[in-house]
Amino acid sequence: MKKILSAVLAALLILTLCACGSSGAKDIDAQALADALKSGVAFEDTLSAVSSDELAFSLSGMPENYIAAGYRADGTTSEEIVVVQCGNKDDAAMVKAALETHLAELKDQASKYQPEQLPLLDGAILTVGGNGAVLCVTADTDTANSIIKEYVG
């Protein structure tokens, strides 16, 4: 009886561990994904790295511990890459909200000063996966989505 019970419990443990296994989403490496997007996606303007201090200033409502990497257009376009890696999936939801607010602010500014940039911003990619989130403002959304999928799953 004990052997049967042990076997059943072992089987349940294995099933439980399998259920908690990979859901397809990978943990995000913020700098690696931001670099891959910058080098692999077509942008109209040249993009320059944004410091973590600048990103922290731009993104309100972020969790306590996170790593962010980003690039912004040097010219007059709204092109931008922001990748945020956080401690867990709950923090990723906070990051998504912060990126949504940031995108809304970009749209508000564009509507006043650069209305021709609104279609680009309306087509921006905002994705949450694994332990982070990605915002990519580009016209080359097919390539960007492909790269994001490769890194996030």
Q: Which sequence ranges carry the predicted segments?
A:
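Short, compositionally biased low-complexity segments enriched in polar/charged residues
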Residues: 47-78, 90-95, 121-122
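Positively charged n-region of N-terminal signal peptides that target proteins for export
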Residues: 1-11
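Short Gly/Thr-rich strand-loop-strand
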Residues: 89-129
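Second-shell loop/turn segments in exported
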Residues: 80-88, 132-137
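A short, solvent-exposed beta-edge/loop patch
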Residues: 73-74, 116-153
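Post-signal peptide N-terminal segment of mature Sec-exported envelope proteins
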Residues: 28-46
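C-terminal motif of bacterial Sec signal peptides marking the signal peptidase cleavage site
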Residues: 15-19
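Bacterial signal peptide processing site
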Residues: 21-24
